[in-house]
Amino acid sequence: MHLKYYLHNLPESLIPWILILIFNDNDNTPLLFIFISSIHVLLYPYSKLTISRYIKENTKLKKEPWYLCKLSALFYLLMAIPVGLPSFIYYTLKRN
């Protein structure tokens, strides 16, 4: 996957975290929702399109293969690890 996409959408996925830090929100903000939405904004629109295009280019298939959904879910999780790890660490530290 391309680094340019990550760098373009990284500030967009960090906006909820920046707002919490700016306004010093001490009440029970749904941090898990913010954590999931920041990962979803950054990764989901790109993951399935890129994987399907890569498979079609390399295998010369005309239609989507049966394993595309499982493969895109696996790559979605693998891409979410480096993006969501800082948010997850912040979420667990704030919870304790």
UniProtKB/Swiss-Prot annotation:
This is Colicin-K immunity protein. This protein is able to protect a cell, which harbors the plasmid ColK encoding colicin K, against colicin K. GO terms for biological process: bacteriocin immunity. It is found in: Cell membrane. The lineage of its organism: Bacteria, Pseudomonadati, Pseudomonadota, Gammaproteobacteria, Enterobacterales. Disulfide bonds: none annotated. It comes from the Bacteria. Keywords: Bacteriocin immunity, Cell membrane, Membrane, Plasmid, Transmembrane, Transmembrane helix. The keyword Transmembrane helix applies. Pfam families: CKI. One of its GO terms (cellular component) is plasma membrane. It comes from Escherichia coli.
